[in-house]
Amino acid sequence: MSSRVLTPDVVGIDALVHDHQTVLAKAEGGVVAVFANNAPAFYAITPARLAELLALEEKLARPGSDVALDDQLYQEPQTAPVAVPMGKFAMYPDWQPDADFIRLAALWGVALRESVTAEELASFIAYWQAEGKVFHHVQWQQKLARSLQIGRASNGGLPKRDVNTVSEPDSQIPPGFRG
């Protein structure tokens, strides 16, 4: 077993028991590592060094300035948890994924850059309501993540084109061609 000794002064436990005052007086920095059975057992420390360390700890615990920031700057507003049905359930119109859905999707191997849009969620819910299948909440979220991954990747990440728009020919001539 490896260990790290935090002082250059090392003494056996027998020597410390025999004459602890002399051992501590000779210790550099007022601290000595005490070994038992060829392994570090504990540290012995002088009262003066202990007082120094406690004063240093107290000084570091105090703030560096008297300016204090408002605590509410650090407090994230807590969202009210949405009641999720226990066990398996069929998809219902008000179903929502968890607030940390993007993080969960990453854990499942689905990298989503943006959260689910209202249109994507409505489409997902409408499809699965019609199917009538039942799954646990986490399984519904996994299905939503996969659905978003496939839907967003199908068009190279671009939004789907509107089938009702009439396309217009490109009127620009590329460089290198005569027009």
Swiss-Prot record:
Residues 156-179 are annotated as: Disordered. GO terms for cellular component: primosome complex. It comes from the Bacteria. Keywords: DNA replication, DNA-binding, Primosome. Homooligomerizes. Interacts with PriB. Component of the replication restart primosome. Primosome assembly occurs via a 'hand-off' mechanism. PriA binds to replication forks, subsequently PriB then DnaT bind; DnaT then displaces ssDNA to generate the helicase loading substrate. Involved in the restart of stalled replication forks, which reloads the replicative helicase on sites other than the origin of replication. Can function in multiple replication restart pathways. Displaces ssDNA from a PriB-ssDNA complex. Probably forms a spiral filament on ssDNA. Belongs to the DnaT family. This is Replication restart protein DnaT. The gene is dnaT.
